[in-house]
């Protein structure tokens, strides 16, 4: 028998079943099948409320939300991860550093965020890691394909790299690619908005172009994440142009928001702007 709350709302059991149906429908789609179930379920719950229980509409809303936070950064066709792994493996086996760098760059072009950063990759990481003590452990949250840039970060070979995101196929690819590149690492699938903040200590945590996406899903989620991190240094960045290369006053909006939050928490920080990215290196 379904359990009802005291306010005459729909039966709890039927609500949960509706969420499951929406989640399962979205998960069967080719584009979003690899997304963490927690992410899809959370967005499905919100979509069902917004659509007043209309399940087909909730499926559309869930896919739209996934596009905004995930799908827009990837190509329309599924990334060719097996071929990219073969290219990286062949380049590593050939022993030519230039060939390895070229194969890694081709892989990084699959994701919009890393593709945008490629022209100034070394400059970007010189600014980041030149401002902090040399880390033994780096954590990269909502990482996309950013861990592939390890060779451009100027870090010691023995550095441990912890990477997480919501795409299980992407994380499997990174795990195998970082093995080939001989980077000490651990990868996991994590939905940051659900409160699954990694508990491990890291000397530096990267949260690159991520806070606006978390805040879009739930107000306060991004700042709660940063507060919960076990890192003395946190690198937060914001895009200053959209994927369509429009500025929309993004620098002013994000800089004002960040600096207000930093003042409230008593953080000290360095600021840099490189190409279309506003960077804050926070000491806590």
UniProtKB/Swiss-Prot annotation:
Pfam families to which the protein is assigned, alphabetical: FmrO
Signal peptide: none
Listed InterPro entries: rRNA_MeTrfase, rRNA_MeTrfase_GmN_bac, SAM-dependent_MTases_sf
Assigned keywords, A-Z: Antibiotic resistance, Methyltransferase, rRNA processing, S-adenosyl-L-methionine, Transferase
Task performed by this protein: Specifically methylates the N(7) position of guanine 1405 in 16S rRNA. Confers resistance to various aminoglycosides, including gentamicin and kanamycin.
Family: Belongs to the methyltransferase superfamily. Aminoglycoside resistance family.
Protein name per its UniProtKB record: 16S rRNA (guanine(1405)-N(7))-methyltransferase
Protein source organism: Frankia casuarinae (strain DSM 45818 / CECT 9043 / HFP020203 / CcI3)
Record lineage: Bacteria, Bacillati, Actinomycetota, Actinomycetes, Frankiales
């Amino acid at each position: 028998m379904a359990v009802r709350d005291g306010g005459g709302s729909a039966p709890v059991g039927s609500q949960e079943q509706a969420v499951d149906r929406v989640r399962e429908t979205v998960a069967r789609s080719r584009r979003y099948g690899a997304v963490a179930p927690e992410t899809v379920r959370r967005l499905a719950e919100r979509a069902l409320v917004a659509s007043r229980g209309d399940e087909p509409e909730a499926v559309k809303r869930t896919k739209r939300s996934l596009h905004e936070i995930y799908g827009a950064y990837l190509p329309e066709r599924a990334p060719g991860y097996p071929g990219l792994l073969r290219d990286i493996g062949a380049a590593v086996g050939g022993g030519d550093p230039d060939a390895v760098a070229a194969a890694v760059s081709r892989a990084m072009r699959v994701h919009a965020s890393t593709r945008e950063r490629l022209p100034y990759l070394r400059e970007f990481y010189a600014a980041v890691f030149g401002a902090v003590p040399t880390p033994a452990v780096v954590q990269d949250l909502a990482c996309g394909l950013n861990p592939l840039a390890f060779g451009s970060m100027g870090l010691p070979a023995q550095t441990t790299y912890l990477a997480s995101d919501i795409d299980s196929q992407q994380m499997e690819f990174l795990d195998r690619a970082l093995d080939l590149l001989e980077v000490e690492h651990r990868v996991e699938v994590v939905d940051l908005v659900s409160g699954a903040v990694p508990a491990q200590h890291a000397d530096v945590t990267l949260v690159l172009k991520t806070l606006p996406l978390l805040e879009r899903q739930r107000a306060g989620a991004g700042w709660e994440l940063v507060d919960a991190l076990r890192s003395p240094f946190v690198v937060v960045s914001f895009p200053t142009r959209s994927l369509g290369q429009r500025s929309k006053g993004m620098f002013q909006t994000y800089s004002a928001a960040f600096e207000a939050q930093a003042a409230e928490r008593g953080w000290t920080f360095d600021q840099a702007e490189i190409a279309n990215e506003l960077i804050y290196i926070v000491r806590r």
